[in-house]
Design a protein with these regions (language model features):
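Surface-exposed loop and turn segments in beta-propeller and other repeat-based domains
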Residues: 114-123, 162-177, 253-272, 316-324, ...
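Blade-level signature of beta-propeller repeat domains, shared across WD40, Kelch, NHL, RCC1
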Residues: 444-470
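Sequence/structural signature of beta-propeller modules
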Residues: 2-8, 12-120, 126-129, 135-138, ...
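Conserved beta-propeller blade signature
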Residues: 86-88, 138-142, 191-195, 232-235, ...
Length: 470
């Protein structure tokens, strides 16, 4: 998923019987944890440095109590620290001010408040969405003045929680006027890598020095970025997939570039003309053998699997044949398996600047998900379904289930559509449980990622705050 914050902010103007998940070999392996991140599976929007959208924490599995955090803010970024407190990066409805909230995920329901809040300087509406928790539970984020911030939470003498921001580096000198950072991730050496909308990529060293390069003209970065234990950092632009690394000379360098089919135009349900994927590291040997994205080819789209380190195309497979041919979401990747959800036709109420017209201008949201496995013969489609996923799916290796929120209603969407917490068996793609959530358009997650907490709750950002299941 890319830049859900502005899209969410703009939108602010029954348990079903099923079969239990089938017994299967454990999912994995996952890449080793990044030592400069917080708890694995909960420290980045997509769970980890490799953007796997996989967690080793068990989710609610079935029906549970639903509580709400009504924050009057759109909240796409939900992260949990080692202290079991949640840090949320949101956009306030009033003024669209980026705001950091500190939350207790176990607060009594049905309504809960934040423990502390800290507004950030507003800049480009496209910046400041992706952030992460570092190894001491500080939120690392870039504000509207291009400052790299570290935000810690602490209690004062009265026991009141507060959020404290410290500037670590200024990225302004390496960014063009009007540009904004769209992705952040640490590598395994402690460098903080970033990528900007206008195609600047680089890193900040542990000492605060900034080094950057400019990707080819006309290529924009509309997703976050990912890193692997090998030291490689993956960046997907609107034209190509890259791996970068820090050279011995102390500057970023391109390891390889692989163009993909970006199609002839932006598709309805996507936010830019190109892939909607944050690159996902996965693989059967190290957990980061491969990289995967979904292309934007006209008509049928494809999962592309490339080898990390070389950029060799391992295989490609057509996906989302049962639903809409396009995905704004990052794939889920674990072991030999990739899971993709369609967003084709999803009714985003606003688009980022420069998104361009969609062709066709609109389409029904039919949904659909696909699982693809990589084996010695290439890519193989294991299953497809018609689940209308309205969030980035999250796979739990602890309980062997795939979690999302589904949109409920006709394919031609309306503000009266509902939403359902939905659990799937990743072996078959079958829905094992679903629970309707309260509300209609105000509870639209708009294809943002959920958080599974250490206590087994699932938190999902919405247009006006956060819902908690379990």
């Amino acid at each position: 998923m890319r830049r859900p914050m502005i899209v969410l902010a703009a939108c602010a103007l029954a348990l079903l019987p099923g079969q239990p998940a089938s017994a299967a070999a454990p999912w994995g392996p996952l890449a080793p944890p990044n030592p400069f991140l917080g708890p694995p599976g909960a420290a980045t929007m997509h769970g980890d440095a490799g953007s796997s959208d996989v967690t080793a924490l068990a989710g609610p599995a079935a029906a549970g109590a639903v509580a709400a955090y009504p924050l009057a803010s759109a909240c796409p970024t939900l992260l949990e620290g080692s202290d079991r407190l949640v840090v949320a990066l949101c956009t306030a409805i009033a003024g669209q001010t980026p705001t950091v909230y500190l939350l207790d995920p176990a607060a009594p329901g049905p309504l809960a408040a934040s423990l502390a809040a800290l507004p950030l300087t507003r800049g480009s509406l496209l910046g400041g969405v992706y952030a992460y928790l570092d190894q001491v539970d500080r939120l690392v984020v870039v504000d509207g003045t291009d400052r790299l911030l570290r935000i810690r939470h602490e209690r004062d003498a009265t026991g009141t929680w507060r959020l404290v921001s410290e500037a670590f580096a200024d990225l302004g000198p390496v960014l063009p006027p009007g540009d904004a950072v769209t992705g952040l991730v640490p590598d395994w050496s402690g460098n903080v890598w970033f990528a900007s909308g206008q195609g600047v990529a680089g890193f900040v060293t542990a000492g605060g020095q900034v080094a950057a390069l400019i990707l080819p003209a006309g290529e924009r970065v509309a997703n976050s970025i990912s890193s692997a234990p090998s030291g490689q950092v993956a960046v997907a632009t609107t034209h190509a997939l890259y791996e970068l690394r820090a050279a011995a000379s102390g500057v970023p360098e391109i390891v390889w570039r692989a163009p993909y089919d970006r199609g002839s135009a932006r598709k309805p349900g996507q936010l830019s003309w190109g892939t909607g994927s944050t690159p996902t590291y996965f693989g059967p040997r190290t957990g980061a053998d491969y990289l995967t994205i979904v292309d934007n080819a006209d008509g049928q789209v494809h999962v592309l699997v490339l080898r990390s380190g070389t950029g060799e195309l391992v295989c490609a497979a057509p996906v989302l044949g049962e639903g809409g041919p396009g995905s704004e979401n990052s794939p889920v990747g674990v072991g030999r398996s990739v899971f993709v959800a369609s967003t084709y036709g999803y009714p985003y109420p606003a688009l980022p600047e420069g998104a361009g017209p969609a062709v066709p201008p609109s389409a029904p949201f039919t949904g659909g998900m696909t699982r693809v496995d990589v084996d010695g013969d290439g890519c193989r489609v294991v299953w497809e379904n018609t689940v209308r996923s309205a969030a980035v799916p999250r796979l739990s290796t602890a309980d062997g289930l795939l979690y999302t929120v589904a949109r409920v209603g006709a394919d031609h969407t309306t503000p009266l559509d509902g939403y359902a917490f939905t659990v799937l068996d990743p072996e078959t793609g079958a829905v094992t449980a679903a629970q309707h959530l309260p509300g209609t358009v105000v509870d639209d997650p708009l294809q943002t990622a959920p958080l599974i907490t250490q206590d087994g709750h699932l938190l999902q950002g919405t247009v006006i705050g956060i819902l908690r299941v379990g």
